[in-house]
Regions:
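Surface-exposed interaction regions that form or flank ligand-binding interfaces
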Residues: 1-57, 63-69, 76-78, 92-183
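Polar interaction faces of repeat-based domains
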Residues: 81
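A broadly used, surface-exposed interaction patch
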Residues: 84-92
């Protein structure tokens, strides 16, 4: 067999291996929308709700899960993310691009408090959700996760349990939805 044929075969196999690795890497990472679909019994987006202190607060995403209510602050960034519970600013580094944004945990706590004020009979927590293209450095503080972690933490129940939960949560969820309005 001529050497040039062997070289073409080797290059072709290498290209196929690279493509397969890229596809598997993409499949492995759950996207934000996929994660929300996976965990939610229902959800509402981009609403304001009374904060319990004569004001209103914006909710990006409010999800009804099998465990109760989940307030999400979504950060769909690309690159390495340096976060810390006590840091004032969080940093994102993606190649030569670098930027920072205010630590969202404090405002997330305010959003969770507002939801708890309006839905006292339901458990509620908040999470800062980074997209699959983010790599959170070190151990993320409580309340920070990636889509795969979210799906693992809030597993969707089976159909029977889902119906029971939906019925149990229905009056509370309906009331909460009625208290929300579009900004």
């Amino acid at each position: 067999m001529p050497v040039w044929v062997l070289a073409i075969v080797v290059l072709g196999l290498a290209l196929i291996a690279v493509l397969i690795a890229a596809v598997l890497r993409r499949r492995k990472q759950t996207g934000i929308e996929e994660a929300l679909t996976e965990i939610s019994l229902d959800s509402i987006r981009d609403v304001v709700i009374a904060d319990g202190m004569d004001g209103e607060i914006h909710l990006e995403v409010l999800v009804l899960t099998a465990q109760g209510l989940l307030v999400l602050d979504i950060k769909d960034v690309r690159g390495s993310v340096f976060v810390g519970e006590r840091l004032n600013d969080w940093k994102v580094i993606d190649g030569i691009q670098r930027y920072s944004f205010p630590n969202p945990l404090n405002t997330l706590a305010e959003r969770v408090a507002a939801v708890r004020h309006n839905a006292v009979d339901m458990p509620c927590e908040g999470i800062v959700l980074f997209g699959p293209n983010a790599a959170v450095s070190g151990t993320p503080p409580p309340g920070v996760c990636l889509p795969d972690d979210l799906v693992e933490r809030f597993p969707k129940p089976g159909e029977r349990e889902r119906r029971q939960l939906s019925e149990a949560y229905a009056p509370h969820w309906s009331r909460l939805r009625s208290l929300c309005r579009r900004p």
